[in-house]
């Protein structure tokens, strides 16, 4: 399991590209430089300890959310194929600083989830994970039954995020929490 206080998943390795060790990745990041700027990246297989790799080159495929990248030491298709399905990580301390009112999705993990009933805020659960395939779904564990529900992270459903006060406010449509 990834320690979200230390690591951020920024991409998924989907396939080799060609015969010279190039790798096709699916981006889970809004920052293209994570795949185009040379430097350290980490690759994680399953829940194993991440392994450091040196990104030497990368470019975005036109009209796609995927990139073609090259890692130092990955020189042929077989080596690239062995990385298929693994996650590309960066260290949280290397994450770009954001403007006031902005936050990284990983900061949402462990926040309390509140709803408003009769003008009172009530804690109904906790954000325990993210399901981020460009859909930005919050995995919330409900207090009443320990059930996990997926909540779309959109302004209409999550209008308030207060990192300092450790909560998000939900305004779920009828039935969303019962799914």
UniProtKB/Swiss-Prot annotation:
**Where does it reside?**
Cytoplasm
Specify the PRC barrel domain's residue ranges: 100-176
Major localization class: cytoplasm
NCBIfam families, alphabetically?
16S_RimM (TIGR02273)
Family of the protein in this entry:
Belongs to the RimM family.
List the Gene Ontology MF annotations in alphabetical order. Answer: ribosome binding
Q: Which PANTHER family match?
A: RIBOSOME MATURATION FACTOR RIMM
Q: What is the organism of origin for this protein?
A: Prochlorococcus marinus subsp. pastoris (strain CCMP1986 / NIES-2087 / MED4)
One GO cellular component term noted in the UniProt record for this chain: ribosome
One GO term under biological process is: ribosomal small subunit biogenesis
Establish whether keyword Cytoplasm is in the entry.
yes
What is the UniProt domain comment for this protein?
Answer: The PRC barrel domain binds ribosomal protein uS19.
Q: How does it assemble?
A: Binds ribosomal protein uS19.
Name the UniProt key words of this record, in alphabetical order.
Chaperone, Cytoplasm, Ribosome biogenesis, rRNA processing
**Matches recorded under InterPro entries:** PRC_barrel-like_sf, PRC_RimM, RimM, RimM_N, RimM_N_sf, Transl_B-barrel_sf
This chain belongs to the protein called Ribosome maturation factor RimM
Q: What does this protein do?
A: An accessory protein needed during the final step in the assembly of 30S ribosomal subunit, possibly for assembly of the head region. Essential for efficient processing of 16S rRNA. May be needed both before and after RbfA during the maturation of 16S rRNA. It has affinity for free ribosomal 30S subunits but not for 70S ribosomes.
